[in-house]
Amino acid sequence: MLGDDKDSDDLNLFLNAIGEAGDEEGPTSFNDIDFLTFDDEDLHNPFQDCETSPINEPPKVYVAPRVMISHQDSFSEDSRTDVIEDARILPASPRLRVPASPRAFVYPRSVESPRFGSPRSVESPCFGSPIGVIDTASPFESVREAVSKFGGITDWKAHKIQTIERRKMVDEELEKIQEAMPEYKREAELAEEAKYDALEELENTKGLIEELKLELEKAEKEEQQAKQDSELAQMRVEEMEKGVANEASVAVKTQLEVAKARQVSATSELRSVREEIEMVSNEYKDMLREKELAAERADIAVLEAKEIERTMDGLSIELIATKELLESVHTAHLEAEEKRFSVAMARDQDVYNWEKELKMVENDIERLNQEVRAADDVKAKLETASALQHDLKTELAAFTDISSGNLLLEKNDIHAAVESARRELEEVKANIEKAASEVKKLKIIAGSLQSELGRERQDLEETKQKESTGLARTNDKDAGEELVETAKKLEQATKEAEDAKALATASRDELRMAKELSEQAKRGMSTIESRLVEAKKEMEAARASEKLALAAIKALQETESSQRFEEINNSPRSIIISVEEYYELSKQALESEEEANTRLSEIVSQIEVAKEEESRILEKLEEVNREMSVRKAELKEANGKAEKARDGKLGMEQELRKWRSENGKRRTDEGREPEKSPTRSSTEGRNKENGFGQSKSFAFGEQGSSSNNTGGSTTTNNNNLTPETKKKKKKLSLFPKVFMFLSRKKSHSHK
């Protein structure tokens, strides 16, 4: 409706704006009356009362065409515009005069319209109620063009639909953004991972750069030494050419000074290496002391835990007594519910127990598989050790030229390491074989346990049938004793489990300490090896410099001797050296050679001492590795004991629950024995004869192999038994489980 009103207002404004200049009436504006047609000319028009123009000369009045406007109430494909048909001029209708709007009385318009510039006369005899006359020279052809001059056509319904569509578009974009959020998060995570990888690569490159820097420094030192040696050799050659003697030669002196400086640097480095070795040994001793203190503290903690366990035993016994009293009170209330669900619960519990045992066996098999994998890892390590051995052999072959005496010791060390690795491999193989045998034994034990459980179930059902006749009181005492015994065994199992846990924690701590010690020793070994390599390189450089010096001396001697002979033969001014001077010079040369040899022997002895220290450190490392292997074995044993103790505890708890349910049933049977009718007893006898009271074994979802006839025979045989034999059977039905549990635990401890 609002759109229709607006269109009509715009049309009125247009019709008001296109008047002619010859009109003497004042300007008018349409309010809400669009077109008024009076077919009867005699009808009185109240709007023409104030008109003063003569009747004979009617004014020029524009005949307004009839406009057909069709608004689409239902929305089309393009709902933004209304379909307005072009104005078609229909047959002529009587002329009409339209009064001016009320606004014209208050705000009269100017002579010229501000919008279109059409002149209008304001002179009218009755200014109080002016009449507007519309007159145009050419009529407009289409309403759409006219309306477009005033801002176009609008549809508020279409506008609302546009806003709704925009909102929908915004919601869809939001949903798309929310869907794309996890992808962007993944991309961000991938970028972070790439960042971390880049940082790791940077760290690795930094380490490589540092290593290369160290190698560069070493190469620069060697290059400087080589340059010094070459310069000294050149100087000596120049002196020899000039004819300078050995005593007055500067090159020989500088060579001796350089050799002394190098010897001093080598000795200082050897001292620093010794000091570091002493520091490492002192730290190792301190760590051993701390280890002993930790072991003492662990022993003290174990003693305290045992004392606490003893106190807990007394409290647990008191708790068991109180629980028995409470259960005796609650049995009367829970009789009906236990009778309803006893059979189903027994079956489900048996199935659950067997599944649990199977899971335990599977866990043992998985553990053994893990041990086999660990053995494979040890094999791989042994292969790497063999490769390292091969590398060491190659290094030894290269080092034979330098030190032949130390070859035998290093070979013996390598052979000892190889033998120890072979022994470890044999031990691992033996452990694997033991684990396989343990798996086989566990499977056999599982089968025997299944058969024994079936037998025990049959015995339990037979005892239930017998106890319903009147032997519940005597069996209650025996069951109470058995309950106390089982409670004690449960406490023992809990103690053993806690002891195993404590041992496992202590062994883990010791393992961690041993690993730290081994890492520290490895670091010290690496530093010592690097320094030994540097010392060897310096020794080689010193030997090369000595060789160069000896070669230079020999060349000088040869040149001097040749020059002397030539001078003696050719020139009369030749210098002849006496035999004493010659002997003195030869003695000096021999002394210098002996000094160089003594220095070399000292350096070699220092290297041997460093090698001995290295062998000692290697022995310590081997001892630490052995201790670690022992600790690992102890850890495995402790974990196995803890698992077995947990399993035994669960089995004993299940037996206790069974016994409690049986005890409650017995008491209810005792209370209801006098109330039994002969018909009920007869029906029970029939059920027994038909085999309804037959025992069933629900292990692995299979029924017992006994048929109806055998069930009847067993019931007849059981009725003939005495109360003493019944007590013994009850005890035998419960004790084999305890015996099997203890035997399993002992076998595991022997392993």
From Swiss-Prot:
Organism lineage reads as: Eukaryota, Viridiplantae, Streptophyta, Embryophyta, Tracheophyta
Residues bearing the modification Phosphoserine? 113
Q: Which gene encodes it?
A: WEL3
Keywords, alphabetical:
Coiled coil, Phosphoprotein
Question: Coiled coil where?
Answer: 165-558, 588-647
Q: Supply the InterPro entries for this chain.
A: Web
SUPFAM superfamilies, A to Z: Tropomyosin (SSF57997)
Q: What is this protein called?
A: Protein WEAK CHLOROPLAST MOVEMENT UNDER BLUE LIGHT-like 3
| Similarity comment text for this entry | Belongs to the WEB family.
Span list, region Disordered: 455-479, 625-751
Stretches with biased composition (Basic and acidic residues) = 455-467, 625-689
Query: What is the scientific name of the source organism?
Result: Arabidopsis thaliana (Mouse-ear cress)
Q: Where do Low complexity bias regions lie?
A: 704-723
Q: Which is an annotated Pfam family here?
A: WEMBL
